[in-house]
Amino acid sequence: MRCRPKLWCIVVLALFPGTLPAADLVFSVTEGVTYQATPKEIRDKFEPLAQALGTALKRNVRVVLVPKYNDVREGLAKQEYDLAFIHPAHVALAEVKAGRYKTLAWTAGYTEYTVSLMVNRNDTSKTLPDLKGRTLVTPDPDSITAWMVRAMLRTASIGSNEVKIRTTRYQDAVPFYLEYGFADVGATAANSVVKEWTDKGGKVFLKSRSVPIKYFIVSTKLSADEQERIQRALVTLAQTEPGRQVLGAVGYKGFVTPDHAVDTAAIDWLGL
């Protein structure tokens, strides 16, 4: 009697359940809305990292670009992504608070992100209450910079009707509003923007508290063993030459183990 192919497959799977290849691990990437980069540039950056993680996990890691914050929020809410690299912090931390994801790593060099409040050289502002009745420009309202500005105002008990807030999409557009009188104060977290502004004689009168900004989070659906292997692979990249080549491609110095107490404090401060 001939053994039908389907029956044979069932027998093989019963005897050798580990013979099927593991499903792809879905790795979503969301970069900030206030930086300008093409999808191809972002994908090219992260493919070597995906390959390195795949080697550590012995399974294929598939990169999925999710540029829009609301799109990644929707996917995270359904735990469609096994692993996610997310800039900005508030999107990642909302999922950490919800318990659907855990922080695996922070990005080295991006653990103390601060907002600078810039003014023209003759401005006399010294404290946040000095902003009352004035116009403040921030990047995109759903950028981490804008979220941090709102946290600063809330902490200082300044109501939303006491400061007029204008928004512009990109960080490097903020000085334009100050130069041409469309705003009195400009908020940015881009060091290059701050340097250019102060080099021209402008001032920074106040800085925010700092928060980590670029997060690696992992779905709580993954096993503890897989979570640990991903974290170990990330934080040890800088220790080997192949790992440093991966970091060179992605454009970061490395990844570090997070401090969960800092995450908890940031969740509270940002009002998530």
Can you say where each PLM-predicted feature lies in the sequence?
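A ligand-binding cleft/hinge motif common to bilobed small-molecule-binding domains
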Residues: 88-98, 150-151, 155, 176-207
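Bacterial N-terminal signal peptides that target proteins for export
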Residues: 1-9
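Bacterial N-terminal signal peptides
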Residues: 8-18
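Short helix-initiation/N-cap motifs at beta->coil->alpha
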Residues: 63-74, 161-176, 211-212
